[in-house]
Amino acid sequence: MRAVLDTADIAIVALYFILVMCIGFFAMWKSNRSTVSGYFLAGRSMTWVAIGASLFVSNIGSEHFIGLAGSGAASGFAVGAWEFNALLLLQLLGWVFIPIYIRSGVYTMPEYLSKRFGGHRIQVYFAALSLILYIFTKLSVDLYSGALFIQESLGWNLYVSVILLIGMTALLTVTGGLVAVIYTDTLQALLMIIGALTLMIISIMEIGGFEEVKRRYMLASPDVTSILLTYNLSNTNSCNVSPKKEALKMLRNPTDEDVPWPGFILGQTPASVWYWCADQVIVQRVLAAKNIAHAKGSTLMAGFLKLLPMFIIVVPGMISRILFTDDIACINPEHCMLVCGSRAGCSNIAYPRLVMKLVPVGLRGLMMAVMIAALMSDLDSIFNSASTIFTLDVYKLIRKSASSRELMIVGRIFVAFMVVISIAWVPIIVEMQGGQMYLYIQEVADYLTPPVAALFLLAIFWKRCNEQGAFYGGMAGFVLGAVRLILAFAYRAPECDQPDNRPGFIKDIHYMYVATGLFWVTGLITVIVSLLTPPPTKEQIRTTTFWSKKNLVVKENCSPKEEPYKMQEKSILRCSENNETINHIIPNGKSEDSIKGLQPEDVNLLVTCREEGNPVASLGHSEAETPVDAYSNGQAALMGEKERKKETDDGGRYWKFIDWFCGFKSKSLSKRSLRDLMEEEAVCLQMLEETRQVKVILNIGLFAVCSLGIFMFVYFSL
């Protein structure tokens, strides 16, 4: 009989929803969502604790609870390799990539590629690829896994549940922006860890300890005779009934079908660089840090937290197979269909089955809230990051003169568009059931992301890499990967009791080896074409490579108080007013010619500094909130003051409420003095500065977390 929610369970779930919505509305009150950086980068005001929790929970979504536990049930420890690998790659993000992103002054990863190489070809290519991956892999898999848990554990209507969750998540993201996302992620991280640890302790106590888990897992084979008699199956064949011989090893022999160690090190690891160091969902959170110390601290915290999934998700999945062997390890497609509604296998129900059978009343509601937290955290991450990429890397190319207000509106409309696509994808997701969902995700990503990882690594570590090399190398890798992906879908793996008649290059070459080839072929083509074509300009590599860390060039000499402006890449327009020289700092993306024709009242974000004397006390047309708001890196450089005033005068209470609710206007957008603006610029300059004491502490943490990661790999692979 299917378990149902008790009154206590319902109360806990309801309390969770109330807390989440309260946090979202709190973010609406406290944050400045009416600017590009305020909405998309949380005003660069987040601490390492909040960002570290957000990094963890954004990655550990519902597909991890379903997919990781399912792969643990099907193949043992192997899937834990991705978690320990992430632990190490997070530090690569914090110590190498993030300083470059901050120094480059970018919001999105496509924007970085555009700034590093010039032009828009690579920017558009990467933006389109990211949106495809978000919508058709991350989003679809998250919805399926979350819906599977709800359906398996609670018996709720699948479509109503999914639509409700999507709607709440979209409302939270649209109203609060990244501040709301990070605040709620902090709550959800705590909730996830408590709930998952509780289930882990209960399940291990049920088995009798960790060593007993390993012993009994290797004996967890279904009773074929009993199953045939119980279900009266017409198909008496059985397959994949016994645990794999290397189930208790993580990195396995080179021909293993799950994790061959050469493929994982040479192919999967470089491919994972895209997710952890160049994926908007992850990087956008770290870019919201107050400074580089908080950014590094957040990756250290997330790295330590990545030790947990192996024990709180993978091991419970293995325990589920031990306790419910005949269901989790179904013997053939007909049996699997009767047990879980999927002919490919039933390992994906391992975690929800464990929850419903072992967790007592009350705690079951907590676990339900954990799964909702996982689903919503992933969805809000995708909604926010995808809308950022679309708004700043696609829409901005179409509407180059778009105001900051227009960008905010477009970002929110795109979230609504993604909601519609998500709901339309639900029927397709229900049919897209695989035996090991998590490995399915990795396979799709490994066909598309290795070329991107190669481009980012070459862009950062090799100054000679230019736009032509990156474009042709990236496109070659993309075409090869797309062809392999199409072939993989065209020649699907047969059911386990059927012969495999696929071509040898499909069935015998592991996807990690394909990823290896894509990564190195892309890199080779990029290097060759770059060497045969002109090198990049000095401006393109001035702040965008690893070797230009300290190279902040000052274009004009101003007074010491004005130095904070120099870290931004700006052109200087010199003009004369009443025999007094004035420097206007022109935001990126604007030429002098485009500025000269503007009237003072039409200019909103030109920052003025005088060469002699103190700055003026106030500047009537400056409304910048933070250093990032002032420049917006070319994204919101100019906004029409006249249009804003007209809208304010004509709008009634209703429109004022709508503006506040959606973050189009903010009570904090008062006129700012130039002195305040310069102080904020000083803070921006200090983002890359670290004291010696902080450096020592962070480096000790780096050594500790990397040592732990390597130890885990060795311990679980020998």
Curated annotation (Swiss-Prot):
Membrane association type: Multi-pass membrane protein
Side of membrane Cytoplasmic, spans: 30-38, 111-123, 184-186, 325-353, 431-443, 533-695
Swiss-Prot/TrEMBL site (Implicated in sodium coupling) positions: G24, R285
Annotated transmembrane regions: 10-29, 39-57, 87-110, 124-144, 158-183, 187-205, 304-324, 354-376, 407-430, 444-462, 511-532, 696-716
A GO term for molecular function: transmembrane transporter binding
Major subcellular location class: membrane
Induction (free text): Induced by hyperosmotic stress.
Residue positions, PTM Phosphoserine: S594, S632
Localization: Apical cell membrane; Basolateral cell membrane
InterPro entries in alphabetical order: Na/Glc_symporter_sf, Na/solute_symporter, Na/solute_symporter_CS, SMIT
Example of a GO biological process term: myo-inositol transport
Reactions it catalyzes: myo-inositol(out) + 2 Na(+)(out) = myo-inositol(in) + 2 Na(+)(in); scyllo-inositol(out) + 2 Na(+)(out) = scyllo-inositol(in) + 2 Na(+)(in)
Gene Ontology cellular component list: apical plasma membrane; basolateral plasma membrane; membrane; perinuclear region of cytoplasm; plasma membrane
Ranges in the topological domain labelled Extracellular: 1-9, 58-86, 145-157, 206-303, 377-406, 463-510, 717-718
PANTHER family: SODIUM_MYO-INOSITOL COTRANSPORTER, SOLUTE CARRIER FAMILY 5
Family: Belongs to the sodium:solute symporter (SSF) (TC 2.A.21) family.
Assembly description: Interacts with KCNQ2 (via the pore module). Interacts with KCNQ1; this interaction is direct. Forms coregulatory complexes with ion channels KCNQ2-KCNQ3 and KCNQ1-KCNE2.
Name the record gives this protein: Sodium/myo-inositol cotransporter
